[in-house]
Amino acid sequence: MGTPFKMERGVKYRDAAKTSIIPVKNIDPNQELLKKPEWMKIKLPANSAKIDSIKNGMRRHGLHSVCEEASCPNLHECFNHGTATFMILGAICTRRCPFCDVAHGKPLPPDPEEPRKLAETIQDMKLRYVVITSVDRDDLPDRGAGHFAECVKEIRQLNPNIKIEILVPDFRGRIEQALDKLKDNPPDVFNHNLENVPRLYREIRPGADYQWSLKLLKDFKAMFPHIPTKSGLMVGLGETNEEILQVMQDLRDHGVTMLTLGQYLQPSRHHLPVARYVPPAEFDEFRDKAQAMGFEHAACGPFVRSSYHADLQAKGEIVK
C-alpha cells in the first residue's frame, strides 16, 4: 500500500490535488468540454489604475478577496467599479467543493489583527458598501462566527455610515453558537448560498447539508426580522429547472427575500464540468418567477454572482 496523503498546514491544495480527495470521483480532466456560447464570452479590459490600487491595498494589509481566490469572471468589472468582496479567515478552506477554485487544506490560525486591518483598508478605499465572506473553517469551535462579528464591529467603528453584507459558511454543527456570536454586531444583509439543488449536494458540496443551510437562514431571520436574508444559486451543474424553482420556493418558505442566480463556470479541467449553458432568456424567466414567488430582489443572469453589484442589489436595482 502507498503512503497515505497527508496535508501540510498552511499549504494550498488546488485543482487535481484538491479534487482527488472528493467523495464522488467523476471528474475526467481529459473529457471534451462544452463550447462556450457567444453570450458567455466577455472581453477582459487591461488592468487599470483602480484595479491595481485595490489589489495593492489588499496586499499591503495582508488581506484576500474572493474575487481573486475564486477566479471570479467579474473581477475586472467590480474592481473598476471600486468594489470588492473581502475574504477573511485566510485563503485555505477546510471543505473541498469541486466547483470552487478556492484552495483546500489545513488553514493557519486566524489573524487577530485582521478585523482592524480590514476596517482600515475599507476606510482607505472609501467604500460605502462592503461584502465580507470567508472560507469554511470547520477547524474552529465557532466555525469562524466570532471573527465575522469582530470584523463587523471594527468596520463600523471606523466607517459608521457603511452598509455591510456578510456571506457566511454554514457554521456546520454550530448554528446556535454562531448566531449568538453575531447578535451584538449583526450585518445589514445576511447572505448564505445554497449553491444548487439538494439532489446534487453529495457530488458538489461534500460536507454540506441542504436542510442545515435552510435552517441557518431561517434562524437568523427569526433573530433579526428586520435584516434581509439572501442566498445564491448556480445553474449548469446537471440540475433541472424544476429543481431550481423548488429551491427558490424553499428559500421563500424560510424567509429569504433576496436571490442571486448565475451560470456555473468550470475553473479548470480538474473541476466539475459545465453540464449546460443556460440562455439569457431562461434567466429572465427565473427572475420573473422569483418576483412572482415574492422575492423582493432577484439578480438573475449568466455572469451574476452572489456579491456581484451587491450594493445595487441592496438598493433594489435590476442586476443581470
Curated annotation (Swiss-Prot):
GO terms for molecular function: 4 iron, 4 sulfur cluster binding; lipoate synthase activity; metal ion binding. It is found in: Cytoplasm. It comes from the Bacteria. This is Lipoyl synthase. [4Fe-4S] cluster 1 binds at C67, C72, C78, S307. PANTHER family: LIPOYL SYNTHASE, LIPOYL SYNTHASE, MITOCHONDRIAL. InterPro entries: Aldolase_TIM, Elp3/MiaA/NifB-like_rSAM, LIAS_N, Lipoyl_synth, rSAM. SUPFAM superfamilies: Radical SAM enzymes. It catalyses: [[Fe-S] cluster scaffold protein carrying a second [4Fe-4S](2+) cluster] + N(6)-octanoyl-L-lysyl-[protein] + 2 oxidized [2Fe-2S]-[ferredoxin] + 2 S-adenosyl-L-methionine + 4 H(+) = [[Fe-S] cluster scaffold protein] + N(6)-[(R)-dihydrolipoyl]-L-lysyl-[protein] + 4 Fe(3+) + 2 hydrogen sulfide + 2 5'-deoxyadenosine + 2 L-methionine + 2 reduced [2Fe-2S]-[ferredoxin]. Its main location: cytoplasm. GO terms for cellular component: cytoplasm.
